[in-house]
Structures are given as C-alpha cells and as structure tokens.
C-alpha cells in the first residue's frame, strides 16, 4: 500500500471552495489576466489548498488538478523573475513571490498525491496502468518544482517532500512502472529519469549555485541524467567514490557514500561513474579549446564560469569533499562588510574591534556565529535591517574574541521566509589580508586598482604552503599578465599565474612575485 503525507479532509469547512471545474477555470483565467502574478499565485494557491482538504470524486479532483496545473505552469516563470536573481535576504515582493511559488508547488503536489493514493488502492483497473503512470509522472514533476523553487530562493525544502518522493519512486519500481514512458509526446521521459533528475540536482549542492546556474544544471541533466544508475545492490565498498545513498523511508535527500554515516531501513544506491566520465570528457574538450553550448555565451567570462561549474559538478557527483573538521557550536558576535571596495578599506587595518565602528569606512552589519571549523563559518544575520548579500560575495569579518581581520567568500545561503536575516556559510580565505594597489606593467600609474593580497601562509588549516593570491577588480587583469604592486611604501612586480575564483565584482588569482 502506498502511504503518502496528506492532509485530512474537513467535513464542514468554514469557507467551502468552489469545485465546479467550469467555474474554477473561468475564475482562474480572470486571475491570470491581472497585472500582479504574485497576487494571482497567492490567491490560486490558497484556493487549491482549500480544495485539497475537502472530499470529492476522483474524476472531479483530476479535472480540477489539471486546471490548477496549467495555471501554475504559467505562473512559476513569472514568479521566478521576482526572486531568482536578487540579493538576500529576500524582502518585499521578492519574498512574497518566493513564498507563493513554493506554496503553489506544494499544493499541486498534494492534489496529485491524493489522486495517486486513491488510484494505487484500486484492486481492479480496467484501463491498465496508463492513469497510474501519468499520476506518478505528475507527482514527480511537482516534486521537481518544489525543489527548484526552494533552491532558487535558498529556502529549506518543505517537510516530507523527500519522504514522499522516495516512496513514489519505490512504488513505481515495485509496480514495474519506473521505466515506462509517460506518453508519446515525452517518449524519453520515465519515472526513473525524473527521479534521477531530482537526486542529481540535490547532490550538486544547489544552495551554493550562483544566480542562473541552477537552470544550466537542470538543462544538463535533461540530456545526461540517464548516465547515472539506480540499483538495490550495495557497492563493494560502502565508502566508494561516485556512489550516493538514497534513504528510502527518510525525509532527506541522497548523500554521498564517501561521507560515511548510516541510515536504517531500505536504501537505493545511485551510481554516477558513467556520468563522471562524461563530465571528464567534456572538460577535456573544453580545455582543448572546444566550444561551449550555445546557451552559455561566447565571451571568455561565460566560458570560464561554465568550466568552473562543470568542475564543481564533477567534484559533487564523483568525488565530493568529505568534511575534515567537526563543526563547533558558537554564539560569538561577528561584524561583516561585503564587496571588494569595503573589504579593501578594512584590510588597511583601520578597524579596531567588533564593538567599535570606524568613522569614514563602509558600515558593517552584525551577525552571530552558528558553528565554525578552521576552514570557515556558518553565520546568522541578527540586525533588524540586515545587509544585502549574494552567493560568491567576498566579505571582511571580525569575530569577537579574535584579533585581526579575516577575509572569506560566501558559499551558501539558507533563507527563513520570515523576512529576517538569513543564515549563510563562508569559506575562510585569509587571516592576514593586506590592502595594496596594482597596475598593469607599462600602464600609467594613475590607473592603480585597489587589490587585496592574501599571503602565502594564508589559512590555518592548510597542510602545505599554497601560492600567494591576490583579489582584484573583475576584468582588470588576466592570466600571465605582469603587474606592478604598491604595498605600503614598497613597490614590486608580480605575474598572475592562475585564475582561482571569480565572484560579484572581483577575481582571485594566484601570483608569483618577480624580483
């Protein structure tokens, strides 16, 4: 028997919803003509939520679900425009749009799960498995949309989403439907392929994607997700690389086997060896000068970002980094400033402590440490009007109880949907940043650019001496370029040897000093 997380029906709802399909369709069509997609989505989501909590025949619920589905399919892209590429934490219209998008996807999922449970319980099905397969497919589509909306808004996935997704796939596998095509229009779409898409998207660490990267990864998976395989047979070694564990019966996403840990109950193993091989071949072709996909862009920056993204996917799907240090809880106070101009000014050493603001410098915003390792921090914004942040931002931070300024890079977000400050993770780049100025060799001295030098022994967790690095304004310099460095009262030359990272408004290079 298929058991899913469903709300109980209300025998006497305070405000009974309209359930006559022609009336509902006319009402929705009128709402879709209104100028505010956010308000339309909110109202439609509320109506669907009420509909999901009253009893009715299967045929009527299916007809209503399809009407709501087509409306939601129209609204989701419009809602994304309000929150997919903005700074965080979300507020105002962006926050309302994100809430409406996730709510609408969640209620759509409930509508089809009601139908799937009813259809799965039928003992005699004269029409064959066609309707059952279509309902499994719709449930998978709704799950994908819940995840996409959550990832785009950097918000937690709603409770029981993963629990039900695993249960639906296990049900399809048990009934022998997981490899059946849904219909002639989508001859290559099966429940297993849709499930693989959601699993691989979750394994890619989507809360660390830059704006626009989620869509690129989703398109990549539409073509390549079948290179990954699902099996009940455990790998030879439980810590094997390119293997993920799918915890059927638990409400959380797949996790890499090489990270250890164990779960009770049944498991499915996701093997990504062939997918990793495809990624490696594509990276070799790009390194040899091969073309990027047409939708990526032809400029050098877009190409570099795409190559960096593929390398990250290879790392996450094949050899994800295992945690080297335990997280240590803390409640220390922190002040931060985001962006290269502010970080450069604070790197000059003019900020005294967490408790004292410095006149003439950009304002710092208050945060609190949630936990930390030698490699970085998880922080929570604590101000009533928290500062705006973006994934990939470079930040200067000063932690209560520590001497000196640190420089870090924001790696992930977690929104609360409450309009308050968000949680975010940052990777420590240096304990001893040094403000300097640089200009290309033979360029006029008046074109000096603010740069931040990260000394060779720049991180406390490093096991060897990595090359010194330099943070420069985006587009100011390039690899293998010689630059003149002004550090305090001294001048010297350096050659930029490797582009390591790039983020909003800056690039991070390795460099070699030249005598």
Predicted regions and their residues:
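Short strand-loop-strand
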Residues: 299, 306-403, 412-435, 442-515
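Extended, domain-scale alpha-helical bundle/helix-rich regions
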Residues: 160-332
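Generic hydrophobic, helix-prone segments enriched in Leu/Val/Ile
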Residues: 48, 101-116, 220-222, 304-322, ...
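Sequence-level detector for tyrosine residue identity
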Residues: 68, 73, 112, 151-154, ...
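Intrinsically disordered, low-complexity regions
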Residues: 6, 25-29, 41, 236, ...
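Generic N-terminal leader/targeting and pre-domain segments
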Residues: 1-160
